[in-house]
């Protein structure tokens, strides 16, 4: 069922290992000056560019320094329009620092984005990529549970998102990263294998 959780499909011997994320708050590189709004754009064209243009239309009217991470591979020159800076990409630790210091984060509703936000304990304004069923599903799910602010591309109201009580909240982080929990699970699994020899 499209709008129902899939807990009933989970095998009895399965375990959740938490979010698998490239981000680690302990390694975050904080920017010299925090940005008020940090937007991380992703997704296929032309939807990526459509969202970028919408953000560039809206952000100049909002006070503060803002950053758009355009999610474009290869060398992309930095651009600045007034108090809005656009860059092609950021290294993981620098991106983590920028997100941690922001008053508002804007991104897609992709699984990796949701897991990254869970890992660093931040909520965000999420914008599902039109035509991608999994992102539209996650958008409905998180809009209903109130964990994130969810708006439709083409109808963004960033000022309202900034004023929302959700925007500045922190969400509980997992005690361990998904990688560490996965490592523990794999070691336990290895111990259950028949004929396992020590030292192999």
Regions inferred by a protein language model and the residue ranges of each:
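Short acidic active-site motifs
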Residues: 93-94, 113, 157, 181
């Amino acid at each position: 069922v499209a709008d129902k959780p899939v807990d009933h499909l989970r095998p009895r011997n399965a375990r959740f290992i938490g979010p698998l994320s490239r981000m680690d708050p302990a390694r975050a590189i904080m920017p010299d000056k925090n940005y008020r709004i940090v937007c991380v754009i992703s997704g296929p064209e032309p939807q990526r560019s459509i969202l970028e243009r919408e953000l560039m239309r809206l952000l100049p009217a909002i006070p503060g320094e803002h950053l758009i991470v355009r999610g474009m591979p290869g060398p992309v020159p930095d651009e600045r329009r007034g108090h809005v800076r656009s860059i092609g990409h950021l290294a993981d630790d620098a991106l983590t620092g920028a997100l941690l210091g922001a008053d508002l984060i804007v991104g897609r509703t992709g699984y990796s984005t949701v897991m990254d936000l869970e890992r660093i304990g931040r909520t965000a304004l999420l914008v599902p990529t039109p035509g991608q069923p999994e992102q539209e599903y996650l958008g409905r799910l998180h809009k209903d549970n109130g964990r994130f602010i969810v708006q439709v591309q083409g109808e963004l109201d960033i000022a309202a998102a900034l004023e929302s009580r959700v925007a500045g909240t922190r969400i509980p982080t997992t005690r361990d990263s998904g990688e560490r929990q996965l490592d523990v699970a794999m070691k336990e699994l290895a111990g259950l294998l028949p004929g396992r020899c020590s030292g192999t």
